[in-house]
Amino acid sequence: MAERIAASLLPAASPSPAPSPPPPRPRVSAAAAASFPCCSTSAGGLRLRSRPSRFPQKAATTRSGRAGAGARAVVRCMAAAAVAASDAAQLKSAREDIREILKTTYCHPIMVRLGWHDSGTYDKNIEEWPQRGGADGSLRFDAELSHGANAGLINALKLIQPIKDKYPGITYADLFQLASATAIEEAGGPKIPMKYGRVDVTAAEQCPPEGRLPDAGPRVPADHLREVFYRMGLDDKEIVALSGAHTLGRSRPDRSGWGKPETKYTKDGPGEPGGQSWTVEWLKFDNSYFKDIKEQRDQDLLVLPTDAALFEDPSFKVYAEKYAEDQEAFFKDYAEAHAKLSDLGAKFDPPEGFSLDDEPAVEEKDPEPAPAPAAAPPPPPVEEKKEAEPTPVPVTVGAAVASSPADDNNGAAPQPEPFVAAKYSYGKKELSDSMKQKIRAEYEGFGGSPDKPLQSNYFLNIMLLIGGLAFLTSLLGS
């Protein structure tokens, strides 16, 4: 292909149609023969120059020789232009910077959410990029950050922007997904088989429309989850596995309208105090999310309608029960689902993407301590004191097993009760300051005030009284 391009660029390479002998050729320097625009630079076209030859017989090359030199120059130009969307070396350096941020700010949950919300707008029914949404870096624009589902993500962008400024050779789309996967791994989760090379959108007009991300409290939670995730091309197993990432993080009523302002697990941090978490150790990635939803023993732990649906819906429940019992199975399925989610809608350059997994595996970062020398004698045995059995915690909501005596079941053993969701935390008791101001403004717009109730509508009261009297008269008359 490069030779054909060179031939089209150099008309001298085509044979002359004239049958008569050509006139004597003027001597052309090598610089003139090889000087043409190549790879784009800030200073204009890059020109390949060499010093004029001291030997005329070598400087005056044949037409085929000049064509070959031009073709080789085009090949060199094309090879230099074939650069991936992101630089692999800069991505690796950015990953180290992300790890340092995670250690100091405990921002694992919001980094996971950043990557998810950039890719979760994908619509498999739309082929064109970027109209189809997905992992394209559009979340950096205010037009998309202002979507209701993205409340609070401006804080994640503030943390990640200095890294983007430091490494301009990587795209936002890659950086968001790199931060998300790194946060999972640093929190103790599985290694995500990621690939990179995502291309960024360039304008706010390319942002997807609002309403493609899942809602926490839909009217029919299971149907809503399927509607949103099926649109992305994900199945029931992937829905449940990805939901398990709620083992990290908290819900804040001033952002989502859900959860308590604080609990015994969040009032002292780490990070910014407050909010309600799904799990006790909400910065540790494990399968506690599924265990805690199933047991429902602690009212300080959050259960959204979409969380409860995982144990209420028959198809979801198969996977939720499995993950509650088998953390290894959860890690495996989650890693695959996360990698798939991070690729949704992305346009890769190169088309196949590239991996950063050419360095030691994660397990090798923290090597196990060396075993004690064989010659060292074992310590004397210590008599263990038998601890008292822990007092069982009563199940107050959503008990998995009925507590009624066998006599109430005609002598049969107690039967499991259907899963009952915990009391949903609608967050209506604690409104954010902005919401309070909005409600107050609307209230005052109708003529009311905090110190003065709305005046009665006397005309409406009279009409209601007349209507009531007319109704009574009709009854008495009949």
UniProtKB/Swiss-Prot annotation:
Disordered as annotated region, ranges: 1-31, 44-66, 245-276, 346-417
GO BP terms: cellular response to oxidative stress; defense response; hydrogen peroxide catabolic process; response to reactive oxygen species
Record-annotated site: Transition state stabilizer: 113
Tissue-level expression: Expressed in roots, leaves, stems and flowers. Expressed in leaves, shoots and panicles. Expressed at low levels in roots.
Family statement drawn from the similarity comment of this UniProt entry: Belongs to the peroxidase family. Ascorbate peroxidase subfamily.
Chain's role: Involved in defense response and tolerance to the bacterial pathogen Xanthomonas oryzae pv. oryzae (Xoo). Plays an important role in hydrogen peroxide removal during infection by Xoo. Involved in response to abiotic stress. Plays a role in hydrogen peroxide removal durings salt stress.
Extra facts: Binds one cation per subunit; probably K(+), but might also be Ca(2+). Plants over-expressing APX8 exhibit increased tolerance to the bacterial pathogen Xanthomonas oryzae pv. oryzae (Xoo). Plants silencing APX8 show increased sensitivity to Xoo.
Protein name: Probable L-ascorbate peroxidase 8, chloroplastic
Source organism (scientific name): Oryza sativa subsp. japonica
Gene: APX8
